[in-house]
Amino acid sequence: MDWKLEGSTQKVESPVLQGQEGILEETGEDGLPEGFQLLQIDAEGECQEGEILATGSTAWCSKNVQRKQRHWEKIVAAKKSKRKQEKERRKANRAENPGICPQHSKRFLRALTKDKLLEAKHSGPRLCIDLSMTHYMSKKELSRLAGQIRRLYGSNKKADRPFWICLTGFTTDSPLYEECVRMNDGFSSYLLDITEEDCFSLFPLETLVYLTPDSEHALEDVDLNKVYILGGLVDESIQKKVTFQKAREYSVKTARLPIQEYMVRNQNGKNYHSEILAINQVFDILSTYLETHNWPEALKKGVSSGKGYILRNSVE
């Protein structure tokens, strides 16, 4: 069968040209939209194909491409003009309001957060989350612990003076790790240490302080030379003194948050009072105290009203 080229070439239109309007926002290295770059490449291809066709068809091809190029050039010029006007507007606003801090880009803020966390790794306070007790927990409790780790890490990123976090007794093939990856977006990129070793073998025992509500000693200050340990344990059945007994096995110092010293029990209908906090709540208290050196303010940050405690000065 003989194929007729005459009269059919006008219907041939590059698929690249037909789909450009949806990708105007993507730009290449030269600042032009990728669609415009593809158009230029496609135009060369059309002209090469046009050399095989009749002279009249080739002339039509060139005019069609030129028309589309002019259309895209107008769009590109309009976008450049709009960006320039927006830049000049922001510059004028800064000149009129010199006291207002300029808004930083997300990339800049991420870099700033990364620098703060890496600085904490070398010179900041250290906090270990002891994850060696996951065998006590159900799948539901593991999911709750994974959520607490996410919130703790989020609070640490926002802190003016972050801790360096170390997840100890933590294996990548454990159910908890699977929950952390499933529930916490970007968990594998968290800026913290993950190790299978326990906290008692990583640091000198005399530098460790295990924070547990069962301790007899109230935490008076946050010592930058100490390594504080939080028990990664979500226990809905309340198995008492698990973390306290573990600290005693290694003759490690223990301390509790000074809730009894700065707070009192509040009367409530359920007569419920608890000093057991989630690890992210304990972290919020430590982080706030590190910045303010004010225990009432720090405890107010982490001890919710649902625990049945209020600050002493609230009663007075």
Curated annotation (Swiss-Prot):
Single GO BP term: tRNA N1-guanine methylation
Keyword S-adenosyl-L-methionine: yes
GO cellular component: cytosol; mitochondrial inner membrane; nucleoplasm; nucleus; TIM22 mitochondrial import inner membrane insertion complex
Domain of life: Eukaryota
Pfam families xref list: tRNA_m1G_MT
Reactions catalysed: guanosine(9) in tRNA + S-adenosyl-L-methionine = N(1)-methylguanosine(9) in tRNA + S-adenosyl-L-homocysteine + H(+)
Family the entry assigns: Belongs to the class IV-like SAM-binding methyltransferase superfamily. TRM10 family.
Protein name listed in UniProt: tRNA methyltransferase 10 homolog B
Organism for this UniProt entry: Homo sapiens (Human)
Gene: TRMT10B
